[in-house]
Regions:
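Ubiquitin-like/PB1-type beta-grasp interaction modules and other compact soluble beta-rich domains
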Residues: 1-70
Length: 70
């Protein structure tokens, strides 16, 4: 099926959001996903089906240290 992920067209055989996250090699605890302009809670990913033409925005969380101001 054809999906749009972060504005880029991609083909995928994943049938659910959970399978897509696994297929893309993402760490589930480090991303948030919006499917067709709706944020999908992480616990719903395994049973959230994907359909041809779906649009996803995937945000990666990156940890960092704190810097002291000069």
């Amino acid at each position: 099926m054809k999906l749009t992920i972060n504005g880029e067209p991609q083909a995928s055989s994943a049938e659910t959001l959970g399978a897509l996250v696994e297929h893309l090699g993402m760490k589930p605890d480090r991303v948030a996903i919006e499917l067709n302009r709706e944020i999908v809670p992480r616990d719903q990913w395994p049973q959230t089906p994907l359909h041809d033409g779906d649009r996803l925005e995937i945000v990666h969380f990156v940890g960092g240290g704190s810097e002291s101001p000069p």
